[in-house]
UniProtKB/Swiss-Prot annotation:
Core subunit of the mitochondrial membrane respiratory chain NADH dehydrogenase (Complex I) that is believed to belong to the minimal assembly required for catalysis. Complex I functions in the transfer of electrons from NADH to the respiratory chain. The immediate electron acceptor for the enzyme is believed to be ubiquinone. The chain crosses the membrane at residues 1-21, 27-47, 48-68, 87-107, 113-133, 139-159. Keywords: Electron transport, Membrane, Mitochondrion, NAD, Respiratory chain, Translocase, Transmembrane, Transmembrane helix, Transport, Ubiquinone. It is an enzyme of class 7 (translocase). This is NADH-ubiquinone oxidoreductase chain 6. The keyword NAD applies. It comes from Cepphus grylle. The lineage of its organism: Eukaryota, Metazoa, Chordata, Craniata, Vertebrata. It holds the Pfam family Oxidored_q3. It is a multi-pass membrane protein.
Length: 173
């Protein structure tokens, strides 16, 4: 299990690297999906299943809309590739900053790493993410409706902006 968690952490860092050094919006989507899957899998391995599922739906539902919008506005006929020197330079600088942060953080913290799960207080302790689900659905109904309406409005605004002067996604029947 430890190797799997380390693998998920490595995938999360590589996904962040792919988002930070993307040469074009086409490749940013790949890095975002990799980072969100790895991060939510990491949370799932720590025992926070509901929060992991909600974050996964928010990342892939909300952020992919932003990337689709940016891809439609910045559609290059010849986009840069991963192997260009500028992209490799950004990637190497990201890795250098990451290694320096790990080394400095390790010296400051004394290399005291540990994993604490949500239900580490015992058998009779209520899990925090399950007790939060009831509050989320009982007190948050109005916020769900407002957020859903806002997302629907955002979708129509993005579709209207993308279509430009041509007859695009929203047409009068």
């Amino acid at each position: 299990m430890t190797y799997f968690v380390v693998f998920l952490g490595l995938c999360f860092v590589l996904g962040g690297l792919a988002v930070a050094s993307n040469p074009s919006p086409y490749y940013g989507v790949v890095g975002l999906v990799l980072a969100s899957v790895a991060g939510c899998g990491w949370l799932l391995s720590l025992g926070v299943s509901f929060v992991s599922l909600v974050l996964f739906m928010v990342y892939l539902g909300g952020m992919l809309v932003v990337f689709v919008y940016s891809v439609s506005l910045a559609a290059d006929p010849f986009p840069e590739a991963w192997g260009d020197w500028g992209v490799v330079g950004y990637g190497m600088s990201f890795i250098v900053v990451l290694v320096v942060g790990v080394v400095v953080g390790g010296f400051v913290e004394g290399w005291d790493f540990g994993v604490v799960t949500v239900d580490s207080a015992g058998v009779f302790f209520a899990r925090l993410d399950f007790s939060g689900v009831a509050m989320f659905y009982s007190c948050g109904v109005g916020m769900f409706l407002v957020a859903g309406w806002g997302l629907l409005l955002t979708l129509f605004v993005v579709l209207e902006l993308v279509r430009g002067l041509s007859r695009g996604a929203i047409r009068a029947v």
